Amino acid sequence: MKNLNNLFLFALISLLTVSLNAQSVDEIIENYFENTGGAENWENVQGMKMNASINQMGMEIPIEMVQLKDKMYTKISVQGMDIKQGVFDGETLWSTNFMSMKAEKSDQEDVQIVKDELAEFPDPFLNYKENGFTAELMGTEVVDGSDTFKVKLTKKPMVVDGEEVPNVSTYYFDTENFVPIMMHEEVMSGPGKGMIMEAKMSDYQEVEGLYMPFSMSQGVKDQPGQPLTITSIELNVEADESEFKFPETETEVQENN
């Protein structure tokens, strides 16, 4: 009987632990949205434009990023030239080749990955359960001197090089303010396959009632990241459709005429 009671007690504790873990994850996410303006206000965000800059060898390089629910582009201004990266018009994904300075289209696997990422806009934790994602509290961890909740977000698998691979991001939420200050993702293809990419976020400021990070850095885990300073953020902007269009070559223009 004693062993039976112990077994029952162990099972009860296990159930409570699972329940508390799930509740804690939900509480962290709820507090995150509450502290950054409210989930309802986040749901009203249909588009976002960010102006930022990075420093390369002492030279400040302006960057303009526009993201909508189905389109996006990044424009980098270098020595009077605008170079576009990660441009998506809803169907075609393209970027400017830095060597040839010509626009090149991406394959359909990359197109689908971008479509899935845009479906998460403006935040992957917003309605994450309805999107089929799961969130799990992995414990606590100290990040740059701050205590954080380590939350693993598992999204729908993505297809890379013809194979279905896991799609997992790990977020580190500050335990005091409940905002993410770091995020990790594993590189699933290319020369950096297997590496852990690290993004850090800080200097949260108010933008039309919502709080967003104005200082970021991105790079490989355990290596110095590239700092990104955001100078302005606009919400629900009306973007020029021509900014997303894949540029036609002179030959294509002549053929169309």
Language-model regions, residue ranges each:
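Flexible, processing/modification-adjacent segments and terminal tails
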Residues: 23-30, 34, 92-163, 190-192, ...
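N-terminal mature ectodomain segment of secretory-pathway/periplasmic proteins
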Residues: 27-101, 139
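Short capping micro-motif at the N-terminus of alpha-helices
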Residues: 63, 85, 104-105, 150, ...
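Bacterial Sec-dependent N-terminal signal peptides
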Residues: 1-25
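Short, solvent-exposed loop/turn elements at beta->coil junctions and helix N-caps
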Residues: 53, 138-142, 186, 204
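Gly/Pro-enriched, hydrophobic low-complexity segments
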Residues: 147-244
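Short, surface-exposed beta-strand-loop junctions and turns on beta-sheet-rich folds
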Residues: 80-82, 101-103, 187-189, 220
